[in-house]
């Protein structure tokens, strides 16, 4: 899999496709998933052209890496699913074919608002 600048997340970042934005800063955008799998289902993506987590960790600046990590926590707070609520959430990213990655742009799913269930079936 290689990075495709016409993937849906790249189009959202270029504002060619609308999204229901939750959070944004210089390095990260978060928005609601259009096909939620749980009561709360958000996506958190870096603004750079990163294919997956390995690509991101190898090429992103320290500032981008910290921004993405902190954004996940900030989004969980905005959505009311953060650790301090006592409920929690699952943060998930898929990597390549065997990992189930469908969109060739690094993205984290945040699932919550209800019990998430088993990790892998």
Language-model features: where?
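HIT superfamily nucleotide-processing domains
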Residues: 1-121
């Amino acid at each position: 899999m290689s990075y495709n600048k016409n993937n849906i997340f790249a189009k959202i970042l270029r504002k060619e496709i609308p999204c229901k934005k939750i959070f944004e800063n210089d390095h990260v955008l978060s928005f609601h998933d259009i096909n939620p799998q749980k009561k709360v289902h958000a996506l958190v993506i870096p603004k750079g052209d990163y294919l997956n987590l390995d690509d991101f960790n190898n090429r992103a600046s320290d500032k981008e890496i910290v921004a993405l990590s902190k954004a996940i926590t900030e989004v969980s707070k905005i959505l009311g699913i953060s650790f301090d609520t006592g409920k929690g959430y699952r943060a998930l990213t898929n990597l390549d074919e065997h990992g189930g990655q469908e969109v060739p742009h690094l993205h984290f799913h945040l699932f919550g608002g209800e019990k998430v269930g088993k990790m892998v079936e």
